[in-house]
Regions:
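Sequence signature of WD/YWTD-type beta-propeller architectures
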Residues: 2-346
Length: 346
């Protein structure tokens, strides 16, 4: 999803506290059901859920929820959080939080009042506890109200927990990939006036897979963190691929394929070395897939009408031409944010 769509999606979550219709060019299309179904209330206490291994973080009505030990519960309550990430051990939670400040901007030669949007990257224990703002999108508050702000989105934590990749959005419309050393906060900029999104680390910590819109239509790129040239993933079926992440063994990517009709999305996996591509869903209303830490399952979002839920499915022998296990519904229709990919840690 491009920067402006990420921003609009973040603002929609913050202001509407729900998923509604995701209007982005590569956002999933969700068709209305035969009849409207009342949505359950936002959970205010732990919700029983099927047992899955590890910890899964997801966004529900603008807040981060964490699934572990057979229940999910909120870790934020302000309704402005998007795009969760987890450390590999599942112990630490990261996410972007949307903020705004009264300011001024020059428009067509005139100075006008403006609500300036930005986002911070926040860290806190996955089990609950105090928050820490790691990166601030309010770069330079100014007494004259011409504040310097930026969007910091899509955090992704390296396997060793020492680095964090983010997408940094600037006023010129660029969306660049930046890796921060978490100890020193020193940035390593890996693109220049790019149009990138959705970073995710390789298991060995040497490469990030991103969605690139540099040529208009989305492409999946493998970008080495030592800043060697990016490599294009080939073998993608007809359609628009986006939001990929690695398998634990580093051999596969799971990603979403938006079909040519512009209305349907499905979860696919592609073998990096061979280009072998496998459809893991075929219903046209599933997206945002991720591998489990042991590589035996995927978690993904699935829509039934306007209701989006988190599902988990055993891969079985699907990556070796076998069959998938049955899907397992995790949430209860409370309002999953369809623009935010879930995260899964041990």
């Amino acid at each position: 999803m491009r920067l402006r769509e990420l921003i609009f999606g973040a603002i929609a979550v913050a202001l509407l506290a729900g998923y509604a219709v995701l209007g982005g060019r590569v956002a999933p299309f969700v068709a209305p059901g035969a009849a409207a179904t009342p949505r359950p209330a936002r959970p205010v206490s732990a919700v029983p859920a099927p047992m899955v291994n590890g910890t899964i973080a997801f966004i529900l009505r603008g807040d981060v929820f964490v699934l572990r030990n057979g229940q999910y519960t909120d870790r934020t309550t302000e309704g402005r959080s998007v795009q969760p990430a987890l450390s590999a051990d599942g112990a630490t939670l990261y996410f972007a939080r949307v903020e705004q400040i009264d300011g001024l901007r020059r428009t067509d030669g005139a100075v006008v009042n403006a609500q300036l949007g930005f986002s911070n990257i926040v860290r806190k224990p996955a089990g609950g506890g105090a928050e820490e703002i790691l990166l601030k999108g309010l770069v330079a508050p100014a007494p004259n109200r011409f504040h310097d702000v930026m969007w910091l989105l899509a955090p992704s934590i390296s396997p060793d927990g020492k680095r964090m990749a983010v997408i940094e959005g600037d006023d010129d419309g660029s969306a660049d990939l930046v890796v921060f050393d978490l100890a020193t906060k020193k940035p390593n900029v890996l693109s220049n006036r790019g149009d990138w999104a959705d970073p995710s680390w390789s298991p060995d910590g040497t490469t990030l897979v991103v969605t690139s819109y540099d040529r208009g239509e989305p492409q999946l790129l493998l970008k080495p963190v030592d800043n060697r040239p990016a490599v294009l993933i080939k073998g993608i079926p007809e359609g628009e691929p986006y939001r990929a992440s690695y398998s634990p063994d580093g051999k596969w990517l799971v990603y979403t394929l938006r079909h040519d009709d512009g209305r349907r999305n499905d979860v696919h996996a592609i073998e990096i070395s061979s280009g072998k591509d496998i459809a893991l869903t075929s219903d046209g209303t599933s997206w945002n897939g991720i591998f489990s830490p042991d590589g035996r399952q995927i978690a993904y979002l699935h829509a039934d009408g306007f209701t989006i839920d988190l599902w988990v499915r055993d891969l079985g022998g699907a990556l070796s031409d076998g069959g998938l296990g049955p899907p397992l519904k995790i949430t209860r229709g409370e309002g999953i944010d369809g623009a935010s990919r879930p995260a899964w840690g041990r």
